[in-house]
């Protein structure tokens, strides 16, 4: 995934155009998805740019475009995972000539940066799926063995002082909560299938 602060980067769009794997572009930190739709349109086309070859030499790279890019709703000034926000984003995707499906990031702006709220976000997406929605095709969840996060500064903090299984970056839900989220989503997909 390409983050909210990097989605506007032309370099990242060019690199994404040459990757033969699905790439998600997050909406802007303000919640705007236009920068993500613009990024998808750019990455879907071929580009020429200077890069470093696998042998370490400077080379001109030509990409063919990546047809497998998508939007990731990560929230902004307000969360954007509810059914109305998802429908509005899909309408914008359709207007841009893109598939009206997307991924939802349960963390960041959608959880108000409170890792436990990711479960609430996932439950809402599960309700949308159970009701028959096919607009959301995937979720991102910050998950680890233990919940929360711990501070670590390389060169300052001792590795031996770290708690095993706890994130040193973003706060995460714990493993048991992750299993419950996956089961809830699985049940929702089964309900949608009838």
Task: Locate predicted features.
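Active-site-facing alpha/beta catalytic cores
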Residues: 1-81, 85, 108-109, 113, ...
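Conserved active-site beta-strand-loop modules that form the wall/rim of enzyme catalytic pockets
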Residues: 69-70, 100-102
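Catalytic-site microenvironment of enzymes
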Residues: 94-95
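Short loop/turn motifs at secondary-structure junctions
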Residues: 98-99, 135
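Conserved, mostly hydrophobic/aromatic
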Residues: 104, 174
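Acidic, Ser/Thr-rich peripheral helices and adjacent loops at domain boundaries
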Residues: 151-172
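Extended, intrinsically disordered, low-complexity segments
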Residues: 177, 185-194
